[in-house]
């Protein structure tokens, strides 16, 4: 019995290990956000000059032929558009999207080497459809380091 409990505990820990706590900034379409190396509400370290991976599962709130990614970062209170983003979300998931269906988007981009170091970073990621916001998440526990 103890072996089964241990196995179940390890399985749950493995599944949840990269899940990040985020605030929904739309209508609760976000089901989960995964970032390798980031856990729950612990600070997520973003490394300058390195790839950053993000995976989100969301439920489409509209039928849409296209989808666009918008990523903004508030660094020590100054909000900026994140440079180097490929805005075409259809490159990272199958389009068109159907209202009520769940989608998994996996996105990787290189963090610019010139990004300022900061211990106070808030990242907002939006996926936009033909009729507005499909999904939106805010990660408040991020830091930019070398």
UniProtKB/Swiss-Prot annotation:
* Organism phylogeny: Eukaryota, Metazoa, Ecdysozoa, Arthropoda, Chelicerata
This protein is called Mite group 2 allergen Der p 2
What organism is listed for this UniProt entry?
A: Dermatophagoides pteronyssinus (European house dust mite)
Does the entry annotate any disulfide bonds, and if so which pairs? 25-136, 38-44, 90-95
The record's listing under SUPFAM superfamilies reads:
E set domains (SSF81296)
Key word Secreted present: yes
Task: Give the subcellular location.
Answer: Secreted
A single GO BP annotation from the record? sterol transport
Q: Write the signal peptide boundaries.
A: 1-17
């Amino acid at each position: 019995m103890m072996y089964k409990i241990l196995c179940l505990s390890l399985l749950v820990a493995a599944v949840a290990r990269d899940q990040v706590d985020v605030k929904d900034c739309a209508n609760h379409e976000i089901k989960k956000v995964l970032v390798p190396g980031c856990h729950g509400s612990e600070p997520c370290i973003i490394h300058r000059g390195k790839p950053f991976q993000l995976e989100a599962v969301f439920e489409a709130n509209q039928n849409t032929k296209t989808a666009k990614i918008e990523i903004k970062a508030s660094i020590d209170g100054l909000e900026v558009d994140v440079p180097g983003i490929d805005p075409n979300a259809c490159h990272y998931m199958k389009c068109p999207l159907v209202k009520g269906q769940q989608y998994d988007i996996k996105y990787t981009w290189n963090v610019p080497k010139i990004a300022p170091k900061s211990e106070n970073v808030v990242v907002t990621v939006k996926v936009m459809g033909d009729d507005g916001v499909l999904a939106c998440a805010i990660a408040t526990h991020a830091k930019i380091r070398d």
